[in-house]
């Protein structure tokens, strides 16, 4: 075999000229111990708080505790195949998730991996999971309404775009149902929705996805799921990841609605991680910074100034109470962070009042400014009316004889409570709500039997759609309730009463 020395020399010369003297310098550590979703690593002395690290099995971790001789890392993935003595690489980057239109309609885990069997998310857009919330100067007041389609909420505790409204109550009292109804009502409103399931049973998440698909809501919704079987670090990261995806739309001038279901379980996951990391426990064994864990999350929901595009994130955090104990640590923390709360009461729920919102202690601190003028006009005295009714109802139970005026007030109260009941997954438009509440507060239901109220309302709205469709379109187009429109509502109700056939006479 003959060698061509000139050819070998030219190849060597070309290789030397093309040689790129880049050295990939990475800090490498060693796993000292691992278990329960966390690892203690020796050797990563230059790692930053929140920096990503990579384990030998490909799992990603976050530097959580920076100690003198070791680093506490939370593992965002499979920790069962990580062993003591394995190598850990610092990646020099912060955790980020995919964002943009590609995530809409998908069911993802908190890292953006698909859970719906539709393949990876095809996008080049990513957003950091943790960012500092926008400052006061970069925001504007909440002025646009975000309609939930639920009469009791839109009339008494209205929500505006950019608001944080807490939904709080015991388990199985319809908290998730309120949030899902709010998502369903965003159809055609240009609002992107994010449902973040934290510590929920996989079967419960699957049923929520099924409801969203059946009602066509997955076209504008993303579900981020960290189920009950997911490691605590994933449950902890899930709300931040979902918010990061929503921020893409907010910073591009769009609007997003984020549901955190629920933050009690995120707090429990954070407590578990902190105790395993030997952080000192505080009240109810939660770490001292659990308030900051929730405040830095919820402060990212805002209404941006016009200079930044005027986008918004509206959030509906959910908190589960035990035996109605709203004065516990996590509930009081989140109540103080949010702009109001919807308190759902078990007694109301089991007596058939659904949604089971207690109007006495449910408030919206900033949503009133966002309420439409028509809704504000018809629902102005509704909260006081219902509060007075509850007091009268308690008084009437003593068996005292009531004068006719008090009895009439009590009877109207029963009808208003019945009117504010609403079946699940049947949100109403603002125009329909205005007609319905106007008829109730102005005494047009006083001669309708209490048991008939819901049927009367349903048939009335159908009648208005069929015979007075211009009234619906005028109410939708005009924010204020003029005297002329009010007269048309009264005329439509009176006209409907002539054709309405009650099943039972008025009580």
Swiss-Prot record:
What is this enzyme's catalytic activity, as reactions?
ATP + H2O + 4 H(+)(in) = ADP + phosphate + 5 H(+)(out)
Site keyed Required for activity: positions: 362
What cellular component GO annotations does this protein have?
plasma membrane; proton-transporting ATP synthase complex
Swiss-Prot/TrEMBL keywords? ATP synthesis, ATP-binding, Cell inner membrane, Cell membrane, CF(1), Hydrogen ion transport, Ion transport, Membrane, Nucleotide-binding, Translocase, Transport
Query: A Pfam family in this protein?
Result: ATP-synt_ab_N
Q: How does it sit in the membrane?
A: Peripheral membrane protein
Primary location recorded for the protein, binned into one broad class: membrane
List localization entries: Cell inner membrane
Which positions are tagged coiled coil? none
- Which EC numbers characterise this protein's activity in its record? 7.1.2.2
Q: What does this protein do?
A: Produces ATP from ADP in the presence of a proton gradient across the membrane. The alpha chain is a regulatory subunit.
Name the record gives this protein: ATP synthase subunit alpha 2
Q: Which organism is it from?
A: Rhodopirellula baltica (strain DSM 10527 / NCIMB 13988 / SH1)
Write the gene name. atpA2
